[in-house]
UniProtKB/Swiss-Prot annotation:
Pfam families: Wound_ind (PF08186). Residues 1-47 are annotated as: Disordered. This is Wound-induced basic protein. Residues 20-40 have a biased composition (Basic and acidic residues).
Length: 47
């Protein structure tokens, strides 16, 4: 996989996790965290 290190999103992504070695873990946790977050964001967006 090729990651755009110059991308601000990629840099902030590493900053939040605090390490590029967590890339694999974060990718597996992303879908799990997005599921509950998406449900919580739905009512907030409809308001």
């Amino acid at each position: 996989m090729i990651y755009d290190v110059n991308s601000p999103l990629f840099r902030s992504f590493l900053s939040q996790k605090g390490g590029s070695s967590d890339k694999r873990k974060t990718e597996e946790q992303k879908p799990k965290e997005h599921r509950p977050k998406a449900s919580e964001n739905k009512p907030i967006m409809t308001e």
